């Protein structure tokens, strides 16, 4: 699973996701992609599950780019612990995704296969997504 090797701070504020994505909103590498349509926090496990679904459906053909990286730690207190006594230990890593952000890109497969693979990957994510394709130039 993806997580940073080193961070400046161990814990992060919860934060809010405002606005729409300005960077990472267009296809940069592949011919087809999966674009987020709503603001959401996506965990490293969800990204990995979607990546596995993609590569398995493509039967290892083509190329996959993951355009998001979980760099925000989410802390959690242990079960049945009273409130107070500080913030819990870092539990998982998430990425804050704004609407319009491209999550995955693929290339080297047929358009029909690409759409099927990205639909399977989208089912693993807690977010409404859209299939996008590069316009033929």
Swiss-Prot record:
Pfam name, any one: Ribosomal_L16
Keyword annotations: Ribonucleoprotein, Ribosomal protein, RNA-binding, rRNA-binding, tRNA-binding
InterPro entries linked: Ribosomal_uL16 (IPR047873), Ribosomal_uL16_bact-type (IPR000114), Ribosomal_uL16_CS (IPR020798), Ribosomal_uL16_dom (IPR016180), Ribosomal_uL16_sf (IPR036920)
A GO term, aspect molecular function: rRNA binding
GO cellular component: cytosolic large ribosomal subunit
Key word tRNA-binding present: yes
An individual GO BP term: translation
Family designation: Belongs to the universal ribosomal protein uL16 family.
Family annotation (HAMAP family): Ribosomal_uL16 (MF_01342)
Function: Binds 23S rRNA and is also seen to make contacts with the A and possibly P site tRNAs.
UniProt subunit comment: Part of the 50S ribosomal subunit.
Designated name of the protein: Large ribosomal subunit protein uL16
Source organism of the structure: Nitrobacter winogradskyi (strain ATCC 25391 / DSM 10237 / CIP 104748 / NCIMB 11846 / Nb-255)
GN (gene name): rplP
